């Protein structure tokens, strides 16, 4: 049994690696930091390969696939990604395009390549509760990337189901999680964050049960349910105010 995890050096990805290792899975771990990956390797007893790749460079996505295509990989976890906070005029276009490359294009490349290979049993795409809403002022591009991940995963699930492919497709949509994401996005959440350990275990357990949409935490589930009934303009105003508070509490 073997799993490939991108963005594995910290946060949810790191905890997923540890949890799957405890379940007996050999691992292929990918992240930019070789030091963090090698440190994680020491904490896990199963066989591990590490690849220090910046996957926002899309050539590295293809290179990664070539490196591991002879392995029998059962689980693909597309976890690599990040967010940017700021008014549309403040965030640099190159930074936004880099985020799109990692959050969307990398995920799609790896998903497509491993599906074509025909060995994969589970794909877990890490999105966000942001991906289930109607837009995120002050994090507009990030919200849009996660909406893409959600909708791509939903459509892929149905296509594979109709073809009777025995492949589990799941999309993880957490609310606030206590990870380095907050520092990179330069925000601080007002809501209580879940631990990455809890989110990782919850997500993988639900993935094995072939749950399509995985939302950890009761409060987030309830919130997402009621948001569906709000008019779009009202929801955008509420979201803007919530985002602004993240900036004011840093």
Question: How would you label these PLM feature ranges?
Answer:
Residues 23-39:
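Conserved glycine-rich Rossmann-like NAD(P)H-binding loop of the short-chain dehydrogenase/reductase
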Residues 9-10:
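Conserved glycine-rich cofactor-binding loop
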Residues 171, 188-224:
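C-terminal helical subdomain
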Residues 87-88, 95-100:
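Substrate-binding pocket helix/loop in short-chain dehydrogenase/reductase
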Residues 111, 145:
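Active-site helix of classical SDR
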Residues 79-84:
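Conserved NAD(P)H cofactor-binding loop of Rossmann-fold oxidoreductase domains
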Residues 128:
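Residue(s) in the substrate-gating loop at a strand-loop-helix junction
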């Amino acid at each position: 049994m073997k799993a490939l995890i991108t963005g594995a050096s910290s946060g949810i990805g790191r905890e997923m690696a540890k949890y799957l290792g405890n379940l007996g899975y050999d691992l292929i771990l990918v992240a930019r930091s070789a030091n963090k990956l090698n440190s994680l390797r020491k904490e896990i007893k199963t066989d591990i390969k590490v690849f220090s790749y910046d996957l926002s460079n899309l050539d590295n996505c293809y290179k990664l696939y070539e490196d591991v295509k002879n392995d029998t990989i059962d689980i693909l976890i597309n976890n690599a990604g990040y967010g940017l906070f700021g008014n549309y005029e403040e965030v640099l276009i190159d930074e936004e395009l880099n985020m799109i490359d990692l959050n969307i294009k990398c995920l799609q490349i790896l998903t497509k390549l491993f599906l074509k290979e025909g060995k994969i049993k589970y794909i877990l795409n890490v999105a966000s509760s942001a991906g289930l809403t109607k837009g995120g002022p002050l994090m507009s591009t990030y919200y849009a990337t996660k909406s893409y991940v959600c909708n791509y995963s939903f459509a892929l699930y149905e296509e594979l189901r109709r073809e009777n492919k025995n492949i589990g497709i799941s999309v993880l949509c957490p609310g606030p999680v206590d990870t380095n994401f907050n520092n990179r996005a330069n925000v601080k959440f007002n809501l209580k964050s879940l631990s990455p350990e809890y989110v990782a275990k919850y997500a993988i357990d639900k993935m094995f049960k072939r749950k399509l949409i995985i939302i950890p935490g009761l409060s987030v589930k309830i919130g997402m349910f009621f948001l569906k009934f709000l008019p779009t303009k009202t929801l955008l105003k509420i979201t803007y105010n919530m985002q602004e508070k993240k900036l004011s509490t840093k």
